[in-house]
Amino acid sequence: MPDTVPTAAELLKPQLPPIIRDLLTSLGAPVRIVHERPGSGPPRVQAALLEDAAGSLLVLFPGDQLLDLHRLKTVVGRDLVPAEARRRQLLDGARLSALPGLPALIDAPCLYDERLLQEPSLLLDSGQPHVLLEIDREVYRSLLADAHGARFGMPLVRLRHNLQRHAAEPMEAVQGFTARRIRQRLERRVEIPPRQNTVRRIHQLYGNLRGCSDDDVTDLIETDPALAAQVVSWAGLSGTAHHPAPERVLSVEDAIVRVLGSEVVLNLSLGLSEGKPPEPPDARDDMTSYWEAALYTATLMDGLCRAMPRGTRPEPGLAYLAGLLHNFGYLTLAHIFPPYFKLLSQHLQINPHIPHALVEHHLLGVTREQIGAWLMEHWQMPEELTVALNGQHDADYRGRHAVYANLVYLAVNLLRNRGIGDTPQEEIPPRLLDDLGLTRARAEEALDRVLAAETALRVLLAQPE
């Protein structure tokens, strides 16, 4: 029947998940369905589900604030942690992509930051990707009738100011007690074992030394961030008075073929593998794994280099390493500083709307990028890698070796646009593309080629026996 055929406008209208639509109807709460748009607009309500031995607590706070569990404890007197298992069960059962700030949806007491009700209207997650609910203040106040209000969120403006001040004055970053302890520990001997899958392949290659080639060893090492970094470091530090190392080690292949040799690399790798392999950082189901993100970024860095004009291309081996190691500080935290890593992981889970650098600097006085860069310096890695790690989130960086930092910024955000990675998405400025000699179309083509090789990349990560 013609009158039942939906119009084009109706087909394009965003739809709410049934459980949210029915809940709003039963509550008699009028809302406006809007598409998610970056930039200004009503404040967004963040919802965090927490728990302790006494039970669960739903916490609602503005999106321009950070939820600090220690500060929250001073308000509620409870040692709360993310209720990740229950959150995931709730989202999966209701087929929601995110937790809406609707207290009636969850069988748990609710605490909200009073500053939410200072705004004329608010935005709530709908549970449908990129679809939000705009709700007037008085309507939302009625939904919070049984909840308790308090002030506990930390304004991001203050956190950004502190981070920018320390970025402008690098020595400030090591003045805090925690940051100072981290740097002092990194200045002692640090060894990070390879992944378990890498260890299995190392044993296989070592058991067949005559049959394995330099390419076999290089291909394996280049899939493991920790092992790749340490192999390049060994090569750079391997010189003696009688046998100096090459002036520059520019890639994993350089380190293996020109300096160390496959047998030495496998022997040293076996020694490293006696330590406990690092667990994948932050193994939340809805996040791309650390290992995948590292390999995707490295592979895309290689593709972007090839797409650049010949005269402006950086060293491809160093560009690949910059991508592979771009998040190396996070892996270092996980392996060397487990208590700090646990604290950080909890706060990243409940503050997914905030760039990780703000969370890390607030909690530790230092960011993962600074930690990774410190370790690059201590291992005497090429300066380009230190710059790439430190400058990767600054789209305006144009200092020494800027091409590496700019390429990492580009690669990470191209991947994030396609749903790979777990950091808040940032705009890619046209000027950055211009300075790299790239167009957005050529950059996207490089990304398409990487994603087309997804099966091959997953095989590399799996390293099947």
Predicted regions and their residues:
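Short glycine-/small-residue-rich flexible loop motifs, especially phosphate/cofactor-binding loops
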Residues: 21, 25, 69-70, 141, ...
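Glycine-centered loop/turn motif at secondary-structure junctions
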Residues: 24-30, 309, 380, 437
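Helix N-cap / loop-to-helix initiation motif
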Residues: 68, 381-383, 439
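Conserved alpha-helical "signature site"
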Residues: 153-345, 353-426, 464
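Short secondary-structure junction/hinge motifs that connect adjacent elements
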Residues: 33-42, 218-221, 427-433
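Terminal helices and disordered tails flanking the catalytic cores of nucleotide-processing hydrolases
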Residues: 1-2, 413, 432-465
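Extended, low-hydrophobicity, polar/charged segments
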Residues: 2-176
